[in-house]
Each structure stands twice: as C-alpha cells, then as structure tokens.
Amino acid sequence: MELKLLNANGQEGAAVNASDVVFGRDYNEALIHQIVVAYQANARSGNRAQKDREQVKHTTKKPWRQKGTGRARAGMSSSPLWRGGGRIFPNSPEENFSHKVNKKMHRAGLCSIFSQLAREGRIAVVDELTLEAPKTKLLAEKFKAMGLDSVLVITDTVDENLYLASRNLAHVAVVEPRYADPLSLIYFKKVLITKAAVAQIEELLS
C-alpha cells in the first residue's frame, strides 16, 4: 500500500510504501464496531448512582389509613411509584461496564481502520513534524498550508513544543503510535503520520 507524502507546504511528494499487513487489509465493519464499543465501555468511569427505596430519606409512616379515604392504598412515601421515591432498579457504581477484546482482535481491528483510511485518502505522511517554539499560531499555519482542519497527528515521539501548541487547537490531537485508539482514528477527518511512526505502527500491529 502506498501512502501520500506531504511536505511543509502541503504539496505531495513521492509515495511512501507501507506494509499491506497493516495498511492493506479488507474492511471488517463488525470487528471495528466491536473494538470501538469496547474502547468506549472501558473508558467509562462507572460512577453513576441512584437510590432505591431503602436509601431515599423518607419517613416510613403510612401516608393515610388503609381504608375509608377513597384514595389508593399506600404504605410509605419512598415507594418507587411516588414522585421523589426510590428507583426500582437503580444504577450502581458497582456495575461492570468492561468489555474484553483479545489482543489479536484489537490489532486486526486497528489494521482494518488504518487500511480503510488509506483507501479513502485520509492518511498523509510527513518526514517529521516539529516546532521551534510552543506557539499555537505556528502549528495552525502548518496545518493550514497542508489543508488540514481536523487531524490526528501520530508521531514517533511527542515533541514538547508540538504538544503544547496543539492543546489550544480544536479538532487536533497528538499521540504516539501506542496510544492511537480506534475512536480517534475514526473521529478525525485526517490522520497525519511521521515516517518513523509508520515503522512503529507496522511493528506494533504486524
């Protein structure tokens, strides 16, 4: 698989040969869906909580007598049928949202995503991406010259200036190959990879 190489001005140069094992796989939508759902589920903090009828603070006194009022019988105001009462099946912080995905499946899913992005022309390669100073304006000018507005930058080592400059840009993220996740790869319109990072990705996923 050949990936297009961009210079600092956004002009295309000679193509970069990439491994077909990583960038030339068939599109497997079911597998991609599985690893994205697992990634989102495992990222949940699991801190939502609601109260059942034992936990809400209500009196246990019977609201009115059982018979003779003409109203429906009621035992206590903490009943789930009442406004302000407890939930019948409340959410708990003890719930387990984790999804298990085998390493082999995870690698295959990432390869499928990279391959589809390459076919759609959403991957571009640069020799390197560095900044002289941690200035957002400098990085924004670089991306503008390349025609990039929503971009995931995958670099072999995250330069401190590059990281600091990217923090204030919307729809821009800078990561190392080992931290490239399936959701980010799908979310951003373009993926910009340094030459050294391409080799690292091939080593990680082959």
Swiss-Prot record:
GO terms for molecular function: rRNA binding; structural constituent of ribosome. Residues 44-85 are annotated as: Disordered. Residues 58-70 have a biased composition (Basic residues). It comes from the Bacteria. The keyword Transport does not apply. GO terms for cellular component: ribonucleoprotein complex; ribosome. Keywords: Ribonucleoprotein, Ribosomal protein, RNA-binding, rRNA-binding. The keyword Ribonucleoprotein applies. Part of the 50S ribosomal subunit. Belongs to the universal ribosomal protein uL4 family. This is Large ribosomal subunit protein uL4. It comes from Paraburkholderia phymatum (strain DSM 17167 / CIP 108236 / LMG 21445 / STM815) (Burkholderia phymatum). The gene is rplD.
